[in-house]
Design a protein with these regions (language model features):
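A short glycine-rich, Lys/Arg-flanked "PGG" loop and its adjoining helix->strand segment in the class I
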Residues: 53-68
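Class I SAM-dependent methyltransferase SAM/SAH-binding core
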Residues: 1-31
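Conserved class I S-adenosyl-L-methionine
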Residues: 68-99
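Core SAM-dependent methyltransferase catalytic element
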Residues: 106, 120-140
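A short SAM/SAH-binding and catalytic strip from SAM-dependent methyltransferases
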Residues: 38-53
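Short alpha-helix
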Residues: 89-114, 133
Length: 140
């Protein structure tokens, strides 16, 4: 089952046997039955959520017992689309925020993965690292 905002992208993804289109900033109700999925993977999306607490509660509802949520993000974003809690926080504060929301909405202590590529000079001679953060939590 897939979710997104772009019908053309979802149609081209052959992994999904079904999908739906929904803006979670307008409605956090997910059109799936209670305890109907085992995993929820959210990649490069959390940083745009205006109501992550509400959506996390809804994800807990649709996940099976001991279902897992996997949230992955980096320090990249369309900053004009991200809420203040994201734009005004450090990378470490963002990880702590996602952790707090998960725990307060029915998930166990998440496993936190942090990976960084070696810094490289970009065309402006600044050192850039490419961080990757992932939190994996199980529904209690």
């Amino acid at each position: 089952i897939g979710h997104g905002l772009n019908k053309q992208e979802l149609e081209k993804n052959k992994i999904f046997d079904s999908y739906w289109i929904q803006n979670f900033n307008l409605s956090q109700q997910i059109p799936l039955d209670k305890e109907s999925v085992d995993y929820c993977l959210m990649v490069a999306a959390w940083q745009y959520l205006q109501y992550p607490e509400n959506l996390t509660k809804e994800i807990a509802r649709i996940l099976s017992r001991e279902g897992k949520i996997i949230i992955a993000f980096s320090n990249r974003a369309f900053w004009h689309k991200a809420p203040n809690i994201w734009t005004s926080s450090t990378e470490e504060e963002r990880v702590k925020y996602v952790r707090k929301v998960l725990i307060s909405n029915g998930f166990n202590e998440p496993k936190i993965i942090k990976k960084f590529t070696e810094p490289a000079l970009n065309i402006f001679n600044f050192l850039n690292k490419d961080p990757f953060y992932c939190l994996i939590a199980t529904k209690e």
